[in-house]
Amino acid sequence: MKNRPTAFSFLFLSFLLSATVLHAQDWQLKRDKGGIKVYVRDQAGTNIKEMKFSTTVEAPLQTIAAVLTHVEGYDDWVYASLKSRTIKQVSDTEAYYYTLIDFPWPFENRDLVLHSKIWQDKKTLALHSKTTSAHWMEGEKESVVRIKKAELYWLFTPIGNGKVRVDYTLNSDPGGNIPAWMINLAADQGPLQTMLKFQEMLEKEKYKNSKLAFVTNEK
């Protein structure tokens, strides 16, 4: 019995050390295009890279939140999105939705069922949006590969003078028989185009005039 706490402590310490090493993995700059910096880093247990996209925009937080929460508008700016629809609107800040993604030949199209939450830090006014897979909520479709691993995180940090720093982190696996090296080679193209189109959406009148109760603009 006396040995059990020691063994448990060793395992727990090993876990903490492993987590610390993973957390300390630095982002590496892959490219800088159109004012958007693209970073990559290794992930534990897979050869597929995690990606982060960073830029600065000039837009009210209300406008940013309006674009992010309008699921039916995703086809206008999310790269290769063929059809996006809300499955369940839990609240103004939480939803489940479906997205069908166009994949290049010879690969089959992909789809995702996702759970998204958005919230604001009342002290810093930073806006957070986290989206994770909810692939079990809707049946899979014929000739379409369901993406079951997906985690997207947006962070919008006000930096003064009406400007906002944008950090978009993406961790996913498209599934199917696509080699990891091929995924890593082209994986940043879609999200990069998404970021560019997202900035265009911020200029649309239907979003610029939005008033959302759960978001406070920077003064």
Which residue stretches match the model-derived regions?
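Positively charged n-region of N-terminal signal peptides that target proteins for export
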Residues: 1-7
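Sec/Tat signal peptide C-region and signal peptidase I cleavage site
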Residues: 20-24
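Bacterial N-terminal signal peptides
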Residues: 9-19
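Eukaryotic helix-grip
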Residues: 25-219
